[in-house]
Amino acid sequence: MARTLRAHGVTTVFTLPGGHILPFLDASIGEDLRIIDTRHEGAAVLAAEGWALATGQTGVAAVTAGPGFANGLIGLLDAATWSVPLVMLAGRTSRNRQGRGAVADVDQRAIAAPIAKWAASCSDAGRIPRYVAEALHRARTGCPGAVYLEVDSHAVYGNAAPLDVVPDGFPVEPSRAAGAPADIGAAVAALAAAERPLIVAGSGAFWSGAGTEIGRFAELAQIPVITASAARGVVPDSHPWSLGSLVHGGLAIPSADCVLVLGSAFNANVMYGGAPLFGTDQTIIQVDIAAERVGGNRAADITVIGDIAPVMRDCCEAWTATPPGREEWLDRGRALAGASLEFWNRQIDEHTGERIHAGAAVRTLADLIHQRFGGSATCVADGGDALAWALAYFRSELPGRLLTTTTALGTLGVGMPFALAAQAARPGEPVFLFTGDGSFGLSAMEVATAVRHQLPVIAIVSNNAGWGDVRYEQDELFGPGRHVASTLPGIRYDRLAEALGGHGERVERLEELAPALDRSIDSGVCSVIDVQTDPDVVSELLRMVAQLGLM
């Protein structure tokens, strides 16, 4: 198993050890396969997802049977929901003991199958290379996704003759299918005829590696671009035709008469393709590698099925119109995005509370990171309202440098797993995590993982002493102050970091953040900066989500 993974280009596996996978972990020693062990199987699989989001490569995690498998399911579910290429390997009770009350005996495949893109079970040591190769292939074929492979103890502990770790027929290069010429022609014609066209690039653009092609087409056709989810940075925010993120640039979408949607489903993240984000009289062009992802909540007027990079390359070649002179439309989009940013800034600047405004903390952090590292730093965001503020202020100049929890699933606790994976993928480069205190608590023990593996992640915790989203909803639904199970008072996350061998800082005034950040960077170890934020602050994004009832 270890040799097959290495032969197919896998360099790093995230895990938590257990008896059902010990031979695999032992074999990794001689195969130059880096093993990063976490403190919870959920963190291991989420870290594999973070590796994929940071690098564009397939992430791999290995967990033991039974409870280990169950703990890891959150990572499989999150990656499956977000179409992230991931392989979850799991141990399994030996086949001759299944159904007899053996240790950790669970029908794991039956549980994983409805979640995963592909789920398989291997009980023959001689077939391990083929199963592993196929798992890696399935994760990247067509629309990327999470796959599950279990190998039972009979196979893992058994003896097998030397095996070909690259079986016949593997590796198989992922399909780079272009769209039908007629569909591409129709899309280009609609965009040429439009007065106010817009490109919205979703996660599929990242997995396709289509940034160059999208940027070129945007300049050629003079169409503003918005990037969302994993596609943040695919077209840099500094690109001459970029409107930045969906938070601010998205305000231009209702004014567009034609929207080219690249690699994004019409889910809750984009208001299901409806109001207030999308209009009813717009021409919608949807490009996706998987036909089953097209339409759904919003029908597309023109559909192109194909890999986004070759589709956009063909769009560039098909574009024969003279430059349409859409600078005025670009200026209008920038004005709308700028007005949105100013609106968010006013919420911060008009704050009079004694504790720090969460938005002020992340705005200051984003400015400091940009000043000191430009676009080379990796930023991770986790939480509810903490995530909203991060989405409003974190810039993105390179793909895989802004990792967030922007799945429709809404998984919390991904922050530390994503951050340590990004740091493992980019040794020597800075990685920053901005997270709420509630979400940080779900994976806080991974500070120990980062310390143990010398991954100097810097986590900035917006500590408003509770589950801010939940408190807000409780206030709105049941009346002010009726908070049940939503307060987390008196926790010193900086001291937790110190107890785990890391560096800790506590920030009570905004001006203390910059020197605390400097000391954390200089410490050279995983650091936690506990920022005391105002529990009464609520972002407009959270208010809007609650009002629209997107859940």
Explain the meaning of each model-derived region.
Residues 126, 150-151, 163, 281, ...:
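Phosphate/pyrophosphate-binding active-site segments
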Residues 1-328, 343, 368, 456-459, ...:
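N-terminal alpha/beta PP-like core and its mobile active-site loop of ThDP/TPP-dependent enzymes
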Residues 202-207, 350-353, 436-438:
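Conserved short loop/turn motifs at secondary-structure junctions
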Residues 20, 41-46, 69, 386-388, ...:
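Short acidic loop-to-helix transition motifs that present clustered carboxylates
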Residues 89, 97-104, 253-256, 295-297, ...:
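Thiamine diphosphate
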Residues 136, 185-188, 213-214, 248-249, ...:
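Generic recognition of flexible, low-complexity loop/linker segments
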Residues 1-2, 6-8, 16-29, 335-417, ...:
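Active-site diphosphate/adenylate-binding microenvironment
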Residues 141, 373-374, 451-456:
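Basic phosphate/pyrophosphate-binding loop/patch that engages nucleotide-derived ligands
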